[in-house]
């Protein structure tokens, strides 16, 4: 039994706010923050938003801003969608109340990286969908703020499908499956095939250096490939090629991955020497694409 003094975890409360003016932003943000300030067993709310919206809140709240955290969204969302998952998990572990209790108002950078290309946008929609599963055990209350003037109608419509408080919400696994149904471009004919049953980190590092990666980046890329290969098991083959300034490795394991959360769940504490697998690859690569096939899978890592 959970007592009032000892709140239990869950469920994750994942909401969406769409606004098209400063007034509409404040009309949804201020009640949410008041709710968070009044919630028992919680630290003060945190707002991750565009600098202009943070200024609106400062002006509206005045001295009432108090201990509310105000974070420019370009500082929070400084990397990939997978990085944002790690950022959120780390913040909750360090700062949330019992069971993950905290109110977070979160505005992704749709005018920047998140909205810069259809591929990037797809990864952020995946992030929004999988958040419903990844954070399900926690009692966190998240309000995802969408400025329709910046995000645009297509992104807002896609995001509505990922938030349980909308009438068009869909199963996160269905959305992930839709995104993974988009075929990847075929590897180029001159892709380099790596010898052996598993790619050697040294060979990947040397190849990446020849392609122009700095030694430190080549080391990170080689480690990501090795970690992913170790997690995926026996490989049919591994290919390397350059895509503009980026280095790409495609791993072809002989078995399917069959896990839409692969690489998105932070690994548990492990003994020294044990790897972090696809989690590490997703954290350091620009993209990690997984496509299951009848006789195995294609797992493509793009660095840079």
In which residue ranges do the predicted regions lie?
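Conserved short strand/loop->alpha-helix "switch" segment adjacent to the catalytic nucleotide/phosphoryl-transfer site
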Residues: 200-233, 270
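Amphipathic alpha-helical interaction surfaces in cytosolic regulatory modules
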Residues: 132-135, 225, 232, 257
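Positively charged, polar, low-complexity stretches
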Residues: 1-185
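STAS-typified acidic loop motif
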Residues: 73-81, 189-202
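Short, well-ordered alpha-helical scaffold segments within catalytic/effector domains
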Residues: 26-30, 128, 197-201, 222, ...
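Short, flexible active-site loops
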Residues: 182-191, 204, 209
């Amino acid at each position: 039994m959970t007592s009032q003094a000892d709140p239990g975890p869950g469920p994750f409360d994942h909401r969406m706010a769409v606004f098209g003016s400063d007034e509409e932003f404040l009309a949804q943000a201020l009640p949410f923050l008041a709710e968070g300030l009044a919630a028992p067993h919680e630290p003060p709310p945190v707002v991750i938003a565009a600098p202009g919206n943070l200024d609106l809140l400062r002006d509206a709240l005045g001295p009432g801003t108090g201990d509310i955290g105000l974070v420019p969204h370009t500082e929070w969302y400084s990397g990939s969608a997978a990085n944002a998952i790690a950022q959120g998990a780390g913040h909750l572990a360090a700062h949330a109340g019992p069971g993950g209790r905290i109110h977070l108002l979160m505005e992704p950078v749709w005018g920047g990286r998140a909205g810069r290309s259809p591929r990037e946008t797809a990864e952020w929609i995946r992030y929004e969908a999988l958040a419903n599963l990844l954070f399900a055990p926690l009692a966190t209350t998240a309000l995802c703020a969408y400025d329709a003037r910046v995000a645009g109608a297509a992104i807002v419509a896609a995001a509505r499908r990922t938030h349980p408080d909308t009438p068009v919400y869909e199963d996160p696994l269905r959305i992930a499956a839709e995104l993974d149904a988009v075929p990847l471009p075929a590897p180029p004919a001159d892709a380099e095939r790596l010898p052996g049953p598993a790619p050697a980190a040294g060979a990947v590092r040397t190849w990446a250096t020849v392609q122009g990666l700095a030694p430190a980046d080549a080391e990170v890329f080689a480690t990501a490939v090795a970690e992913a290969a170790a997690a995926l098991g026996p490989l049919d083959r591994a290919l390397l090629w350059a895509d503009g300034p980026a280095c790409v490795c495609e791993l072809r394991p002989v078995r399917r991955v069959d896990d839409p959360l692969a690489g998105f769940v932070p690994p548990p504490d492990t003994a020294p020497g044990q790897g972090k697998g696809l989690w590490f690859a997703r954290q350091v690569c620009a993209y990690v694409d997984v496509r299951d096939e009848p006789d195995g899978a294609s797992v493509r890592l793009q660095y840079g």
